[in-house]
Design a protein with these regions (language model features):
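Gly/Pro/Ser/Thr-rich low-complexity, intrinsically disordered segments predominantly at protein N-termini
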Residues: 1-177
Length: 177
């Protein structure tokens, strides 16, 4: 089902159903827990401060991957655009870094969403795994997977490929302890 089929008169600015749209299906996600929210808040703050005017940050907003796929990642670090995203939705080419914070949603984020991100050429995805206290860094999309993978944990640092000068410590604040 194309996304326009549930939009009044096909208007992209109309109210949309709650939840991600994955391959035409509306997927209701579990409510966000305290650790999940705290991690998103910490990452949002750090990325906004570090990126400054070089990028925009879109927390928990839809990203249009395909005609029938529009997930709502926890964070999308996106390129500035002249239209300020009023005329067209955020798409894969706009995304500099996409972040999914996962506790109960890890398997879904890793095995359903990540291949979709790779297939649509989202250049970099981080999965913040709150269960194992690590951040998975996925880069270089190829077909439905990423060819570069790294895992960082407490005491390490992580940097977006688009902004290697942004160095974030993987600490208790990011991992929400």
């Amino acid at each position: 089902m194309p996304l326009t089929s549930w939009m009044p008169r096909g208007r992209p600015d109309a109210a949309r159903p709650q939840g991600s749209v994955i391959e035409g299906e509306i997927v209701k996600m579990s409510p966000i827990g305290l650790r999940h929210a705290a991690s998103v808040i910490a990452l949002t703050r750090r990325l906004i401060l570090a990126a400054g005017d070089r990028a925009r940050l879109s927390p928990q907003n839809p990203v249009r991957l395909l005609g029938d796929t529009e997930p709502e990642p926890d964070i999308a670090l996106i390129r500035p655009r002249a239209d300020r995203y009023v005329r067209a939705p955020i798409g894969p080419r706009d995304v500099l870094l996409l972040v999914e914070v996962a506790d109960t949603s890890y398997r879904y984020d890793r095995y359903v969403k990540l291949p979709l991100y790779a297939r649509t050429r989202v250049r970099e995805v981080w999965i913040v795994d709150l269960v194992h206290d690590v951040i998975e860094v996925h880069r270089r999309p190829s077909r439905d997977r990423y060819t570069s993978f790294a895992q960082v944990g407490p005491g390490d640092t992580v940097s977006p490929a688009a902004f290697p000068d942004i160095v974030l410590p993987v600490d208790d604040e990011l991992l929400a302890h």
